[in-house]
Amino acid sequence: MTRLVLASASAGRLKVLRQAGVDPLVVVSGVDEDAVIAALGPDASPSAVVCALATAKADRVAGALQAGVAADCVVVGCDSMLFIDGGLCGKPGSADAALRQWRRIGGRSGGLYTGHCLLRLRDGDITHREVESACTTVHFASPVEADLRAYVAGGEPLAVAGGFTLDGLGGWFVDGIDGDPSNVIGVSLPLLRTLLTRVGLSVSALWAAD
């Protein structure tokens, strides 16, 4: 039975997949994201950046799987970033950075890009590789200073792309989106369904594999 392997430590991605009927095997890649981005150069498009990161994660995990899993599985690597003002915003990493980022994006709109890399493995070999990104436009509110500081102090925005969540406390400060909500959380179900179809798998086969 085909197993889905999620090459990500993201709680949001895991939640999306579980709510959609798939309980993946989670394997964290440990990829040096800064090194991958640096190798691309300053002119790389948002799609190229998130796809390169997703691919690096999927490749790293695929090469480390136990034989029993690698015999029949799909490895899914994802990476998300917010594109606004001609630049990419990743995970703030600190409270000060999160505050600066929110003061930049508050009251504005940006594109949340998520790169997806799907690897089909049979008998330990990669038989198919599909790489694509999805973008959802996010319209941000302008939180009052007290709310913004409380949000940042709680720690939620520090380790998520763009410094916000759609399905957590950050949802209070998103006025709306244009596009796929699951993409904002970190894995686009419509795109993942398309990629699975390209490698000959249906989503219902994964429902039975959890």
UniProtKB/Swiss-Prot annotation:
Pfam families: Maf. It is an enzyme of class 3 (hydrolase). Its cofactor is a divalent metal cation. One of its GO terms (biological process) is nucleotide metabolic process. Keywords: Cytoplasm, Hydrolase, Nucleotide metabolism. GO terms for cellular component: cytoplasm. Signal peptide: none annotated. It catalyses: a ribonucleoside 5'-triphosphate + H2O = a ribonucleoside 5'-phosphate + diphosphate + H(+); a 2'-deoxyribonucleoside 5'-triphosphate + H2O = a 2'-deoxyribonucleoside 5'-phosphate + diphosphate + H(+). Its main location: cytoplasm. It is found in: Cytoplasm. NCBIfam families: maf. PANTHER family: BIFUNCTIONAL DTTP/UTP PYROPHOSPHATASE/METHYLTRANSFERASE PROTEIN-RELATED (PTHR43213), BIFUNCTIONAL DTTP_UTP PYROPHOSPHATASE_METHYLTRANSFERASE PROTEIN-RELATED (PTHR43213:SF5). Belongs to the Maf family. Nucleoside triphosphate pyrophosphatase. May have a dual role in cell division arrest and in preventing the incorporation of modified nucleotides into cellular nucleic acids. HAMAP family: Maf. This is Nucleoside triphosphate pyrophosphatase.
